[in-house]
């Protein structure tokens, strides 16, 4: 089976590099990805995709990108097993390559 996702969009927030208790770098953010099609008489719709980067990828993203930057992400879609505080299901791109 194949689980490969490629996304291109703009980073929607300021990036923050965090470190876990075991010393691993991590950052999480969302990107705004416009849909390819627009129904006649309607505005283009945008999807907001949550991304998590670990280790050197996290450090690279925080060093060279910022809010509003266009970024391409390749990885695997992984569904999370919890709900956010607002009750929505969360999804993220795991094992991402920037």
Q: At which residue positions do the language-model features occur?
A:
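Single-stranded nucleic acid-binding surfaces, predominantly the OB-fold ssDNA-binding core
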Residues: 1-97
């Amino acid at each position: 089976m194949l689980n490969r996702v490629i996304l291109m969009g703009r980073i929607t927030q300021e990036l923050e590099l965090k470190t876990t208790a075991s010393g691993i770098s991590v950052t999480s953010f969302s990107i705004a990805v416009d849909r390819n099609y627009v129904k006649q008489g309607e505005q283009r719709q945008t999807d907001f995709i949550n991304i998590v980067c670990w280790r050197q990828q996290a450090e690279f993203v925080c060093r060279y990108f910022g809010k509003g930057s266009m970024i391409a992400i390749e990885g695997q879609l992984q569904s999370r097993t919890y709900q956010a505080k607002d009750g929505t299901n969360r999804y993220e791109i795991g094992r991402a390559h920037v």
